[in-house]
Amino acid sequence: MAATDVQRASNEEKRSLAMSGHVGFDSLPDQLVSKSVTQGFCFNILCVGETGIGKSTLMNTLFNTTFETEEASHYENGVCLRPRTYDLQESNVHLKLTIVDTVGFGDQINKDDSYRSVVDYIDTQFENYLQEELKIRRSLFNFHDSRIHVCLYFITPTGHSLKSLDLVTMKKLDSKVNIIPIIAKADTISKSELHKFKIKIMSELVSNGVQIYQFPTDDDAVAEINSVMNAHLPFAVVGSTEEVKVGNKLVRARQYPWGVVQVENESHCDFVKLREMLIRVNMEDLREQTHTRHYELYRRCKLEEMGFKDNDPDTQPFSLQETYEAKRKEFLSELQRKEEEMRQMFVNKVKETEAELKERERELQEKFMQLKRIHQEESKKVEDKRRDLEEEMNSFNRRKAAMEALQSQSFQATSQQPLKKDKDRKN
């Protein structure tokens, strides 16, 4: 019997029965809540945006606390992701919150690879979770899940259009993380410009195929509010932890010479909408989407690379041992092929080196013979010059000896004439 037939038969055999008394499995939701509260929750936020755009301030405002952060410089050589984990507690619910900041994002002159560090970080967290899942003795209960649940993408309030860096980065991230675009420092542009800017942003995201996170509408309990809030994306937010007195009460706001921008006033900005959607309504859906959609996509690709794959219902499923053996044979075959390629490459390299050495030896031999001929020619020239010089010296010596003999004879003849005159005078 095929697998589909078995499944069809099992579906037909299901029957609804009435119980005559209370059993107790209606407490399962309470058990799940109790277990979840005891275990606690984790939530990981990735803040992507340029330095000084207000990422840290918004996080402080969202969670109504002050997180310890370091001042970021505008002169970073590259993009560095800096995670910080905090333990928060509200009522009896414990939350392990991790905020990951993209230090130096958008500060470089060449921004082509700015997104790469962000993508690598997200993949690394997926890989860490996958490695824990694949362990023989795994402990996912105690494992710190560092997978990114939401990416808050901070858009500079230019009022014109998205930067190419923003489009490229969000396109690279949309299949790996839930993206919620937000317009930072929304109090720097007018309401009319802000409305046009929102429309322009959503139009560019759609035209470039960027898939941002849509608040779910399949749950009747939150379908209406989520549907309304989807129409408000991207949220235009203002962050501030300072309290300003407005009327008779203190509110979180930004004080300007021309007035006050209240953070939690929905007519001033979308901060309340962001907080409602991110924390109070859809936090669990963000965690679930991360696991069931983005992580599963990464896991499937990795397992397919390792040789695992799903089978059709009508085919015989592969066992783990068969998959391992097939992958092992493939690996050994690939290793043998690589070894043969390296051996052949080494042989070719040796032959090339020998040919180069022989060619060099021939060139050196030719140069040696040429120098030897030049030396012989120069030696012959020197010998000829020496011989000519010796002949000139011998000729000179002969002429000198003849000259000296002639001078000696002339001197003797000259000295004899006075003696002869003296003799003649005496006679």
Curated annotation (Swiss-Prot):
Keywords: Coiled coil, GTP-binding, Nucleotide-binding. PROSITE patterns: G_SEPTIN. Residues 406-418 have a biased composition (Polar residues). GO terms for biological process: cytoskeleton-dependent cytokinesis; protein localization. Residues 376-389 have a biased composition (Basic and acidic residues). SUPFAM superfamilies: P-loop containing nucleoside triphosphate hydrolases (SSF52540). GO terms for molecular function: GTP binding; GTPase activity; molecular adaptor activity. Pfam families: Septin. Residues 49-56 are annotated as: G1 motif. Residues 39-305 form the Septin-type G domain. GTP binds at residues 49-56, 104, 185-193, 239, 254. Residues 320-409 form a coiled coil. Residues 101-104 are annotated as: G3 motif. Residues 376-427 are annotated as: Disordered. Residues 184-187 are annotated as: G4 motif. It comes from the Eukaryota. One of its GO terms (cellular component) is microtubule cytoskeleton. Belongs to the TRAFAC class TrmE-Era-EngA-EngB-Septin-like GTPase superfamily. Septin GTPase family. This is Septin-8-A. It comes from Xenopus laevis (African clawed frog).
